[in-house]
Amino acid sequence: MMMQAAPIPAAPSEPYAYVKEPLVQVEQSTLEVTPEPHILQDLSSVDRLFITKRLRVRNVLFLRGKKNRFFVRTSNQNLVYTIEEQNSWWVGYFCYGLRPLQLHVRDGSGKEVMRINRPYACTSRILPCQLQRIQVFSPPGTMIGSIEQVWTAVRPEYVVKRENGDRIFWLRGPRVTISCFRDIQFHIYDNDGIAVGSTCKRWQGILHAMFLAPVTDRFGVAFNRDLIVQDKALLLAATLLLDYMYYDV
């Protein structure tokens, strides 16, 4: 007896219908953009700065002009900024503390983070021909504010303004600004008259006043910790202006 072969199964109506396409799930990664730190970030967590001034004696001896160098430190004695003065060689010998200049502020890596420009202004307490004004740029080329002198016959006053001209602080000093056997403070107030800080020029003794004051000196500024870094930079610039105005001999 002949055996019948098994029937051949019919081909599927659609070729490869039994092959399923693999399901691939692609997770979309979320890119987190970290904001670039502000160029003045070193001031973000400080509430006081201590400044040491040193005259570059070699420049004076070799007739290269009178130029200062400043070292700005925190309360922990960490060096924050180094400031170099730039001016024409002759103005320091004739204009003294009123000389026009530029201050280049550099951080610990040597990067210039701020520049202070001070034009010449002939100023005196009794007959102010011109009032003092400095402009602050951070980064260099971008103005963040200015410090301007207000004429008063008794107590010196200065206003701190942002780049748009809005006043944010004003500084008021004592009637006598000579640092002799006492500390000299300029108090800092906001627009509501609330004290937010002060600058201080400390008395360091009679020997220092007689022999060392023209070469090296120390002063500082204190302010509220929660101020923005631009405002802290403006107060630092105001402190430097006060030193040139009253104590640069």
Which residue ranges define each predicted feature?
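Low-complexity or membrane-interfacial segments used for flexible interactions
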Residues: 1-102, 106-114, 118-133, 139-143, ...
